[in-house]
Amino acid sequence: MYFIFGNLTPRFALKPVSLKVQKNESRDKKLKERWETLLVVLNERFSDGEVIDVEGVLYLVGLQELGQVHRKMKKDDNVNLIHIGICSVLEPYGYYRFDFFDDDGWPHFELLEELPALKAGEQSILMKEALVEYFLKRQLIQ
């Protein structure tokens, strides 16, 4: 099996984290720095000139979790990869739980709790925070 982020297994135990989106300047500054570092690392590895956005990072996480990086993907597969990315990064927050791999090797998740209604800015912060945590746990960034 080949993984896009090195010799990492796609699934391993993650500690639960809190969803609370807090207004804390030093925390926000640290998140911004880590997010920008993550984008630099991912853009250097995977971009052909276009800047990777949140959706692109979720796609890469989905691809990593699927573990089938050389497989030719269909349009529907791309949407499913983003969904896998969302489930994977929000799993430590208690919203999803990995359930099983299907016969084609695709991971399936169980929805444990509906996501709260968040404003667009809060959604963006949550996803960036969850993505940064995902890559911190995998030691791609510090």
Predicted features and spans:
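Amphipathic alpha-helical interaction surfaces
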Residues: 67, 88-96, 133, 137
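Helix-rich interaction surfaces within compact, conserved domain-sized segments
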Residues: 115-141
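Intrinsic, low-complexity terminal and presequence regions
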Residues: 21-27, 56-59, 114-117
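N-terminal interaction modules that seed assembly of large macromolecular complexes
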Residues: 45-74, 82
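Amphipathic protein-protein interaction modules
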Residues: 73-123
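Short runs of predominantly hydrophobic/aromatic residues within well-ordered alpha helices
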Residues: 35, 51-57, 78-83, 123-128
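Ser/Thr/Pro-rich, acidic low-complexity intrinsically disordered regulatory segments
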Residues: 25-29, 34-40, 68, 125
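N-terminal amphipathic/basic-hydrophobic helices that include classical n-h-c signal peptides
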Residues: 1-22
